[in-house]
Amino acid sequence: MALNLQDKQAIVAEVSEVAKGALSAVVADSRGVTVDKMTELRKAGREAGVYIRVVRNTLIRRAVEGTAYECLKEAFVGPTLIAFSNEHPGAAARLFKEFAKANPAFEIKAAAFEGEFIPAANIDRLATLPTYEEAIARLMSTMKEAVAGKLVRTLAALRELREQKEVA
């Protein structure tokens, strides 16, 4: 279906708006993936807070101009599926990585995080970022361990002082 100028402008405006508020972006090639599988991917994306869209390369290039995802322009070759993570940075990368395992025809091209281009080979860097809740849990466990360690050292120091007083 041919798009008229207003449709193209609307697509560019929509994708540009999403890109400005996104935390990260992942670009993939979905050639050879069935419609049913793509529908499953889109549904999983909605549940994970990931905006997924198939966009013409010329339109996506215009949409990312002036955003942190301008570095992805070289990845916009061939059929392009782009996903923007809106809730946590690793969501789209994690979603695409899991989908690619089950669908060999699905190829991740690249990703971007905070204006840095991440090639497909290094997508694990982004996919393994903890969610907000996981990061808080790790921080709390580290703080809890530090407090427990301090308590143990303090009790050991008190015991040594008591032993020294008894000897003297």
Curated annotation (Swiss-Prot):
<dbReference type="GO" id="GO:0006412">
    <property type="term" value="P:translation"/>
</dbReference>
<dbReference type="Pfam" id="PF00466">
    <property type="entry name" value="Ribosomal_L10"/>
</dbReference>
<keyword id="KW-0699">rRNA-binding</keyword>
<dbReference type="GO" id="GO:0070180">
    <property type="term" value="F:large ribosomal subunit rRNA binding"/>
</dbReference>
<comment type="function">
    <text>Forms part of the ribosomal stalk, playing a central role in the interaction of the ribosome with GTP-bound translation factors.</text>
</comment>
<protein>
    <recommendedName>
        <fullName>Large ribosomal subunit protein uL10</fullName>
    </recommendedName>
</protein>
<dbReference type="InterPro" id="IPR047865">
    <property type="entry name" value="Ribosomal_uL10_bac_type"/>
</dbReference>
<comment type="similarity">
    <text>Belongs to the universal ribosomal protein uL10 family.</text>
</comment>
<dbReference type="InterPro" id="IPR001790">
    <property type="entry name" value="Ribosomal_uL10"/>
</dbReference>
<dbReference type="InterPro" id="IPR022973">
    <property type="entry name" value="Ribosomal_uL10_bac"/>
</dbReference>
<keyword id="KW-0694">RNA-binding</keyword>
<dbReference type="GO" id="GO:0015934">
    <property type="term" value="C:large ribosomal subunit"/>
</dbReference>
<dbReference type="GO" id="GO:0003735">
    <property type="term" value="F:structural constituent of ribosome"/>
</dbReference>
<keyword id="KW-0687">Ribonucleoprotein</keyword>
<comment type="subunit">
    <text>Part of the ribosomal stalk of the 50S ribosomal subunit. The N-terminus interacts with L11 and the large rRNA to form the base of the stalk. The C-terminus forms an elongated spine to which L12 dimers bind in a sequential fashion forming a multimeric L10(L12)X complex.</text>
</comment>
<dbReference type="InterPro" id="IPR002363">
    <property type="entry name" value="Ribosomal_uL10_CS_bac"/>
</dbReference>
<keyword id="KW-0689">Ribosomal protein</keyword>
<dbReference type="InterPro" id="IPR043141">
    <property type="entry name" value="Ribosomal_uL10-like_sf"/>
</dbReference>
